[in-house]
Structures are given as structure tokens and as C-alpha cells.
Swiss-Prot record:
Molecular-function GO terms, alphabetical: unfolded protein binding
Subcellular location: Cytoplasm; Nucleus
Lineage: superkingdom: Eukaryota
Organism expressing this protein natively: Arabidopsis thaliana
Gene: PFD1
Protein name according to UniProt: Prefoldin subunit 1
Length: 128
């Protein structure tokens, strides 16, 4: 009876660990993407700023280019930069929360294995 309860607890902890790890990887990928967007916007702004105001600038829309004033493009890039920074900050808090959750689940698993050393042997025999 206790063995079944221990096994069920292990399976539950394992499922939550898999779920949390997947969510953490997803957040890390989203952070990487937003960081890339932020860098692109920053570099584009760095290239636009030294140009004279009367310079013809073009915005890419699909496969076409549309003539836009320099100030409009600068404004769009500044907005992209701000949005990306805000998204990265939000994702960072999510990442920290998920990392705490993963650590908590790891501690729960460690406690379970210390309380029931026999379950570790059963798990190892199941995986082989």
C-alpha cells in the first residue's frame, strides 16, 4: 500500500518536473528571440541616427519597400526596442519563478528518495 503511494508520488513529481522543464525551456527560447529583436532594433537605430534628415529611407513590408521619413522609422525602431526590453523583463520574472519551482520539485524528489531508498532501485530497474 505504502509502496503504491510512494510510486504514485514519484510519478506525480516526475510529471511536474517534465512540465516545468518544458515551460522553462519555452521561456528561455522566447527570451532569446526577444533579445534578438532588441539587438536588431538597437543596431537599426544606431545606423539611422547619424543619417541626415533628408535621407530617403525605406521600410520593408513583405517583398516590397515603402519610402518612409527617417523620423517614422526611428520611432518604430524605438518602440520595438522598448517593447522587446519590456518583454525580456517580463520573461525574466517568469524564468525566475519557474527556476524556483524546478528547485522545489527537485527537493521534493530528493526527500522522497531519501525516505524510500528502495524506490530508487525500482526506478532504475524500470528504466533498463
Amino acid at each position: 500500500m505504502a509502496d503504491e503511494a510512494t510510486r504514485a508520488a514519484f510519478m506525480e513529481i516526475q510529471a511536474s518536473m517534465i512540465e516545468l522543464t518544458g515551460k522553462l525551456k519555452q521561456v528561455q527560447n522566447q527570451m532569446r528571440n526577444k533579445e534578438g529583436d532588441r539587438k536588431r532594433a538597437f543596431l537599426t537605430l544606431e545606423e539611422l541616427r547619424p543619417l541626415p534628415e533628408e535621407t530617403n529611407t525605406y521600410k520593408s513590408i513583405g517583398r516590397t519597400f515603402v519610402l518612409e521619413p527617417k523620423t517614422v522609422l526611428e520611432g518604430e525602431q524605438e518602440q520595438k526596442l522598448k517593447d522587446s526590453e519590456a518583454a525580456v523583463a517580463s520573461l525574466q520574472t517568469s524564468k525566475e519563478y519557474l527556476e524556483k519551482q524546478v528547485a522545489e520539485v527537485e527537493n521534493n524528489l530528493r526527500e522522497l528518495l531519501q525516505q524510500e531508498p528502495g524506490i530508487a532501485q525500482q526506478i532504475m530497474s524500470m528504466s533498463m
